[in-house]
UniProtKB/Swiss-Prot annotation:
It is found in: Cytoplasm. Coiled coil: none annotated. Its EC number is 2.7.4.25. One of its GO terms (biological process) is pyrimidine nucleotide metabolic process. One of its GO terms (molecular function) is ATP binding. ATP binds at G7, L8, A9, G10, T11, G12, T13, S14, T15. Keywords: ATP-binding, Cytoplasm, Kinase, Nucleotide-binding, Transferase. It catalyses: CMP + ATP = CDP + ADP; dCMP + ATP = dCDP + ADP. It comes from Methanosphaera stadtmanae (strain ATCC 43021 / DSM 3091 / JCM 11832 / MCB-3). NCBIfam families: cyt_kin_arch (TIGR02173). This is Cytidylate kinase. Belongs to the cytidylate kinase family. Type 2 subfamily.
Amino acid sequence: MIITIGGLAGTGTSTTAKTLSQEINIPFISAGDVFRQMAVENNMTLLEFSEFAEGNDNIDKALDKRQAEIANNSENLIVEGRISAFFVNADYRIWLKAPDNVRAERISYREDKSLDTVKQEIAERTASERKRYMEIHDIDIDNLDIYDLIINTDTFNIESTVNIIKKCIENKK
């Protein structure tokens, strides 16, 4: 079974993917893992590769292609990434969401930054990603039609979120 888990920064995609992976004993990869692997392959630090990727659409395309290839060569895998659902032939596509203020609080705590700074960064990052995904892939990240399940992670804690996903997977047609 191939499962994708996507969501904007601070919605809990990494935590959910890791926890689900442990509970159902299916490995997971994240877009971040693949990005770090690509940095190593290009003999760059993560920062150098990030800066290189900013001006090079081919990096985004290669990252998406790599995730799809890994998933296509796997029988069971959880793929975590903002737009992985659009590139991976998944059995189940999940989108996690949370209000902007909740996302900002989570990131502020995780990264030990001021809430105001994080709110500004989230606004800029979301606008940048929205524009980039549309320009590079013709993907509107606000259109959630591709997803089988959408969960508000402000409403449910991690345990409940994972339980909802497990129940839905068990009952999928």
